[in-house]
């Protein structure tokens, strides 16, 4: 009986541990070659997942040299990037295919 309780406790720990490590999810939308929101606030010192939804018919590349990420998002589709943990600060990003209009910043606070 004691062995069963230990195994049950271990199974519960293994099952719940990944939930605690899950990153918070944030959404960026691309429309008319612009990111919305232009400023994305995320918690500092935590991993985050950014889902980029491209509502334009053409592809866009989410790129940030300081975040060390490049991800091409096809037109009318979505993609996911994982970043962090980030120290408090501002981390600019661009849409490389439309740099004049597709700009934004991740703000870790």
Cite the ranges covered by each PLM segment.
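Bacterial N-terminal signal peptides that target proteins for export
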Residues: 1-9
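N-terminal post-signal-peptidase region of extra-cytosolic proteins
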Residues: 31-38, 66-68, 76-81, 92
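N-terminal edge beta-strand
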Residues: 23-45
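Histidine- and aromatic-enriched segments that form or immediately flank copper-ligand environments
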Residues: 57-75, 104
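Sec/Tat signal peptide C-region and signal peptidase I cleavage site
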Residues: 16-23
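Exposed beta-strand and adjacent loop surfaces of beta-rich binding modules
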Residues: 25, 47, 57-61, 90, ...
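Extracellular/periplasmic metallocenter environments
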Residues: 27, 74-109
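Asparagine-centered strand-capping/turn motif at beta-strand->loop junctions
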Residues: 52-54
């Amino acid at each position: 009986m004691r062995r069963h309780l230990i195994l049950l406790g271990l199974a519960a720990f293994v099952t719940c541990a990944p939930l605690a490590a899950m990153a918070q999810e944030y959404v960026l939308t691309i429309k008319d070659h612009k990111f919305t929101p232009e400023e994305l606030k995320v918690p500092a010192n935590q991993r985050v997942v950014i889902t980029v939804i491209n509502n334009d018919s053409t592809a866009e590349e989410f790129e940030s040299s300081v975040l060390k990420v490049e991800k091409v998002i096809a037109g009318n589709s979505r993609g996911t990037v994982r970043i962090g943990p980030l120290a408090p600060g501002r981390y600019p990003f661009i849409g490389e295919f439309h740099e004049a209009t597709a700009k934004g910043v991740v703000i870790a606070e």
